[in-house]
């Protein structure tokens, strides 16, 4: 479905839709974030996504520039739009088809998968313009100490596989120059 279709390139994973620029609502991508963090509501944020390999080594996957963390009211409206557009059912069906072939989840029904997406409030909490999404072609290795030096704060995985980037230019120059 085009060069920007993250899912066609990488499959469905924990937050596979975070980088899919083909499935827009009102011209924006809505990314998944596990944490509920009300302190993020009032301003735009730069957020990087990372993963760990089987050895526990860290790798940057990509980032959002100037994304907005949606309030609960905004997420309720988003959920309605996702239902109306058919996008929510499409995503639930993608996950359901994959899980039914996995031994640990083969007993799950479509309704079980649907319940994981939340009922009234969308679990997609980040709003970003497609042009403000970057996914790295090759994952970029880093260490916790690298982040502490650049972010000038202690390392934490408070938000799951994400952290906030106060100074995006400084951050990128440090890690893209490695």
Identify what each model region corresponds to:
Residues 3, 12-14, 28, 32, ...:
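Intrinsically disordered, low-complexity regions
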Residues 22, 27, 56, 137-139:
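Intrinsic-disorder/low-complexity loop/linker signature
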Residues 10-16, 21-23, 51-53, 65-71, ...:
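Short, flexible loop/turn elements at secondary-structure junctions
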Residues 1-9, 72-178:
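Contiguous surface segments at macromolecular interaction interfaces
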Residues 1-41, 174:
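Compositionally biased, charged N-terminal/linker segments
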Residues 32-74:
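Aromatic- and glycine-enriched beta-alpha-beta binding-site module
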């Amino acid at each position: 479905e085009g060069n920007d279709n993250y899912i066609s390139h990488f499959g469905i994973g924990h937050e596979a839709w975070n980088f899919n620029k083909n499935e827009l609502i009102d011209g924006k991508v809505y990314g998944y974030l596990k944490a509920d963090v009300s302190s993020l509501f009032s301003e735009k944020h730069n957020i990087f996504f990372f993963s760990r390999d089987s050895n526990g080594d860290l790798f940057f996957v990509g980032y959002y520039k100037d994304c907005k963390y949606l309030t609960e009211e905004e997420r309720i409206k988003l959920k309605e739009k996702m239902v109306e557009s058919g996008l929510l059912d499409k995503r639930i069906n993608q996950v359901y088809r994959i899980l039914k072939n996995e031994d640990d989840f083969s007993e799950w029904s479509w309704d079980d998968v649907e319940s994981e997406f939340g009922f009234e409030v969308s679990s997609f909490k980040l709003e970003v313009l497609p042009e403000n999404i970057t996914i790295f072609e090759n994952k970029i290795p880093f260490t916790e100490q690298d982040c502490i030096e650049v972010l000038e704060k202690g390392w934490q995985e408070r938000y799951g596989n994400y952290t906030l980037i106060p100074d995006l230019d400084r951050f990128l120059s440090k890690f893209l120059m490695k």
